[in-house]
Amino acid sequence: MGLFNISLLLTCLMVLAIFHSCEAQNSPQDYLAVHNDARAQVGVGPMSWDANLASRAQNYANSRAGDCNLIHSGAGENLAKGGGDFTGRAAVQLWVSERPDYNYATNQCVGGKMCGHYTQVVWRNSVRLGCGRARCNNGWWFISCNYDPVGNWVGERPY
């Protein structure tokens, strides 16, 4: 009986550790840290967390859970989706990975590549951030981050 209890306890601890490691990548600080690191690299000030934006982002992520399609809501936002343990941190890193595809001198994406997620991350006038994450019906994760003030205005440089 004692061995069974120890096995059960170890199993519970492993499940909690896995859950914690997954959730540990989705806190407001996780979203902010990657945003603010990217912003600091180009001399842009840090963002702060906004609970109202986070609530809107979470509501929108929840509404997309049925199909997991990356359809914009019309708010100033970045969207991402991924399988497995796709985290908020991973989503922001994905957006920041577009940096080499942005040419500051021409204020354009290089070679027709996508770079608008990156420019929103570093948009100098966007100073508040709120993000949400929802599990889609297909098992993937849908992540939405909202920015205020809205950025990514055509023809304007992000910083």
From Swiss-Prot:
Free-text function comment from the UniProt entry: Probably involved in the defense reaction of plants against pathogens.
Pyrrolidone carboxylic acid modification, residue list: Q25
Family label: Belongs to the CRISP family.
PANTHER family with a match to the protein in the record: CYSTEINE-RICH SECRETORY PROTEIN-RELATED (PTHR10334)
Signal peptide, first to last residue: 1-24
Coiled-coil boundaries: none
Disulfide bonds: C68-C136, C109-C115, C131-C145
Protein name: Pathogenesis-related leaf protein 4
